Amino acid sequence: MNPPGDAYTDCARFLGTRLEKKGFEVGYHRAEGTPGDNDRYPRTNLVARLEGQASGPCVHFNGHLDVVMAGKGWTEDPFGAVVKEGRIYGRGTCDMKGGIAAAIIAMESLLEEGISFPGALEFSGTVDEETGGYGGVAYLAHQGFFSKPRVDHVIIPEPLNVDRICLGHRGAWWSQVETHGRIAHGSMPFLGDCAIRHMGAFTQLLEERLYPELDKKQTKMPVVPEGAKRSTLNLQAVHGGEEESYDGLPSPCVPDSCRMVLDRRFLIEES
């Protein structure tokens, strides 16, 4: 689950061991120095390659190992992989363990049928897609893993129904907004200045001014689903008052700081 990005190494080695048995040359690449990487949560990427019978293009399959937090409202254990009526229920079964499984089974089926092919097959299991990909795809790209002549074609089996092939996606930009106030005892808020109220005023401005403008922007590209044809802004997280790691009862204080994380998605027509 990401954050914090636990079990990356275990996931990478699980897949790597399976591919190694099929003859793939397997390597594990830790993205040291990237956001989130540390000895407790190492950002370990898997890259596996199998050479064909002659020279030719390389087809590379990529899938991300991480999932976002489970959230609430599940009717099944989100990490139990419960099977019911031909469906697997769990966090990440669609985004994107299903795609990873499909890619690996497709490559294995090719080998099991004894089909010879020129060029090479590659697979990468990468980290941190859900938080920007800095330690995953971006790191491997900077190391030259996806560049020619090593790789010619890349297939990313992200979930988008079985009858659609996408050639790109919207741009992303994450940002933070901070408001500040003055701390005081909660019984006498008039002596302080509430940073959360300031953030509320900022949010109201977004609702009144920015969101109507975003709704006017619509791409001419054949984007799916329909709602994704517009520019979007998601208020991703708000933290104020107590420390973010604090899980006890709140203390009676007027919050002197508040932080909001924004997730902005751009259309191809925007710059």
Task: Give residue ranges: language-model regions.
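Short beta-strand-to-loop capping motifs
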Residues: 50, 179-181, 264-266
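Short, solvent-exposed loop/turn elements at beta->coil junctions and helix N-caps
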Residues: 31-37, 162, 219-224
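Acidic/His- and Gly-rich active-site-bordering loop/insert found
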Residues: 1-89, 112-117
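A short, glycine/Asx- and small/polar-enriched loop/turn
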Residues: 39-44, 53-56, 170-173, 226-231, ...
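Acidic-enriched catalytic cores of C-N bond-cleaving enzymes acting on peptides and small amides
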Residues: 167, 186-246, 251-253, 267-271
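Short glycine/serine- and small hydrophobic-enriched flexible loop segments
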Residues: 105-112, 201-207, 264
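Acidic/histidine-rich catalytic neighborhood of metal-dependent amide-processing enzymes
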Residues: 88, 96-170, 174
